[in-house]
From Swiss-Prot:
UniProt-recorded name of the protein: Probable nicotinate-nucleotide adenylyltransferase
Family: Belongs to the NadD family.
EC category name: transferase
InterPro entries, sorted: Cyt_trans-like (IPR004821), NadD/NMNAT (IPR005248), Rossmann-like_a/b/a_fold (IPR014729)
Organism: Campylobacter jejuni subsp. jejuni serotype O:2 (strain ATCC 700819 / NCTC 11168)
Length: 181
């Protein structure tokens, strides 16, 4: 079985994330794309939308797609989970012959700082979703999504133009309510 893992905060999920999902399904030779929202990103101190809300948004957007599985492994841990831990969990579950790990190009600069990076690098093939024309190392796959969207911009400005239509209204209401509190 060939699998790909796309993890993230999805705070909120947006058209950039959607491009990654659709490109991965189209371009990668995989049997399953596992989308795994984090409880909290190991490199962040907090999140805006709680984990249940982010999981529901992700499930609503992509849970119905063929080959897609929405996984709550990291959320169930109730703590920051390094990628290597999620990868090992999925290896035990699926014993894949090929394992792709989808990450944003913005992570490349600090990738070597990821927990147990050498082991992680030996277990997966990195697939990079490029959003700012960042140079991709030759040993990584380039997904060529080139969507320049950041969840932080959506949260800060309440501009939901780049939020997927299916959840646009509820995302706007959710963050408006957070800003009022």
């Amino acid at each position: 079985m060939k699998i790909a893992l796309f993890g993230g905060s999805f705070d909120p999920p947006h058209n950039g994330h959607n491009s990654v999902v659709l490109e991965a399904l189209e371009k990668l030779d995989i049997d399953k794309l596992i989308i795994m929202p984090t409880y909290i990103n190991p490199f962040k101190q907090s999140f805006s939308a709680d984990e249940k809300q982010r999981f529901l948004w992700v499930k609503k957007l992509w849970g119905h797609l063929p080959k897609v599985e929405i996984c709550d492994f990291e959320i169930r841990q109730k703590r920051p989970v390094p990628s290597i831990e999620s990868v090992k969990y999925l290896y035990k579950l699926y014993n894949p012959s090929k394992f792709y790990l989808l990450i944003g190009a913005d992570h490349l600069e600090k990738l070597h700082l990821w927990h147990d990076f050498e082991k992680l690098n030996s277990l997966v093939e990195f697939v990079i979703a490029n959003r700012n024309d960042i140079g991709i190392p030759k040993n990584f796959k380039d997904l060529k999504t080139n969507k320049k969207i950041a969840s932080s911009f959506i949260r800060d400005t309440l501009n939901t133009n780049e939020v997927c239509e299916e959840i646009k209204d509820e995302v706007k209401k959710y963050y408006e309510k957070l800003q009022k509190n």
